[in-house]
Amino acid sequence: MDNIRNFSIIAHIDHGKSTLADRIIQLCGGLSDREMEAQVLDSMDIEKERGITIKAQTAALSYKARDGKVYNLNLIDTPGHVDFSYEVSRSLSACEGALLVVDASQGVEAQTVANCYTAIELGVEVVPVLNKIDLPAADPDSAIQEIEDVIGIDAQDATRCSAKTGVGVPDVLEALIAKVPAPKGDPDAPLQALIIDSWFDNYVGVVMLVRVVNGTLRAKDKVLLMATGAQHLVEQVGVFSPKSVPRESLSAGQVGFVIAGIKELKAAKVGDTITHVVPRKADAPLPGFKEVKPQVFAGLYPVEANQYEALRESLEKLQLNDASLQFEPEVSQALGFGFRCGFLGLLHMEIVQERLEREFDMDLITTAPTVVYQVMQRDGTTVQVENPAKMPDPSKIESILEPIVTVNLYMPQEYVGAVITLCEQKRGSQINMSYHGRQVQLTYEIPMGEIVLDFFDRLKSVSRGYASMDYEFKEYRPSDVVKVDMLINGDKVDALSIIVHRSNSAYRGREVAAKMREIIPRQMYDVAIQAAIGSNVIARENVKALRKNVLAKCYGGDISRKKKLLEKQKEGKKRMKQVGSVEIPQEAFLAILRVEEK
């Protein structure tokens, strides 16, 4: 056990985490040169393209150090994005050490800090590494200063390397072996193994990635999953080198995979503890397990109504590999049949949409994302509302609570003003502001409903892409939010309802109505577009009727003749308006999303 090192790599997007992992795998001979490809550990295409890691992956490597001993290194690759922060904390709790990779030309970024604090809270030894020192713009000294200022760990002896060229990578491994402690644990104690991640394989069912904390796990053992209470028979255990290599057993301190004939992911929850059924069951599960709750909801509808079943199948297949995705059927008068889906955050939502479109060839319409509001009713009950259409009648509502998130923003000094203005527009309240060299850290509390619409895009545009952010849920607070309904000729259109703060409601109502006016085609009669809160109309636009010139045949002549013709036309229009219904084009729903992006 003294020769095992479990570690993960913490880095911001594009700071070279996956490349460094590739180099380490190559150096330790985990894959032959023929099998080596860029970003070995990112298995989904979308991970490679966006350069992000979504699912955790591992590699068990052996490395002969300069002191002549052979060490077993277990690299656990973690997602870097805030939406997947629970997966990150589980991956980190399976390690004793973490390499903090910082781009020497860019310095510290927000997500690095968020994940680094998670690591420090979990008692993981953080080893700073400066990457990309081969770049002409690299400034290692100021990067070291930033690590010390922002994160507060000693970085004077940070290892310098370039993952692209391979310079300094052996030094990184030596530093890792020297600084990271060996795992503690008793191979003879009752079994406790932490599920770091799980995914679905078409041939063997669910594959669980585990870190054995105490005890030994062998094939043919009967095991119990403590959170669900389900029992399974282990079929196979082994390690990834990144290829899967079966082993006879996994003992304390090791990281590997377990296949136990589980059919669905819901049964193997990330963060759960595996123990033996007989003869010795562990007394308590490992700490830190929690159910992941979706934070952002949106409706997904197929463009073609006959694609509904196909969309259901696609979502079910995605759910096999992504237990945090939730969905339930939903019917909208305007868009037909679809699903209300729950996501961990905005990035998660984009990834799910992109995977549906790319891997399953679906054409989708997405409604505006919303968050979960808690509505206290007059009769003392509380309801959770994640869909504007389900908001109770205003007369029954006592108060509405909205989720507030704490947002940490990092940006160069020159963009502070623009970012503060943006946060104020989004009803944020400033908590803290501190300077670290050229970088500024701002902490705000902002309602989550304001974040999910377009905060991230706007932040990137006001700071020319230099600002980075991460957010975490803080609490629910009472807020004066209202539901704005859109009426067309007096009929409510459910899919266009939005929940906004009262102070912003008139502006948003006007914007949406104006946008709809451009999009709805002219009819033979006037079409009234109204935005209303309850029965109170706050904005109105008219789409003018198309009319035929009925006076064209009267050359001169008597006024009463003209009046008669005009009256007759008016009568006809009135009758039409009673029976006619306005078709709302699909673009209108997308327009609502566009309004929010302005």
Swiss-Prot record:
It is a peripheral membrane protein. GO terms for biological process: positive regulation of translation. The keyword Cell membrane applies. GO terms for cellular component: plasma membrane. CDD domains: EF4_II (cd03699), EF4_III (cd16260), LepA (cd01890), lepA_C (cd03709). SMART domains: EFG_C. Its EC number is 3.6.5.n1. Keywords: Cell inner membrane, Cell membrane, GTP-binding, Hydrolase, Membrane, Nucleotide-binding, Protein biosynthesis. GO terms for molecular function: GTP binding; GTPase activity; guanosine tetraphosphate binding; ribosome binding; translation elongation factor activity. It is found in: Cell inner membrane. The keyword GTP-binding applies. Required for accurate and efficient protein synthesis under certain stress conditions. May act as a fidelity factor of the translation reaction, by catalyzing a one-codon backward translocation of tRNAs on improperly translocated ribosomes. Back-translocation proceeds from a post-translocation (POST) complex to a pre-translocation (PRE) complex, thus giving elongation factor G a second chance to translocate the tRNAs correctly. Binds to ribosomes in a GTP-dependent manner. Belongs to the TRAFAC class translation factor GTPase superfamily. Classic translation factor GTPase family. LepA subfamily. This is Elongation factor 4. The gene is lepA.
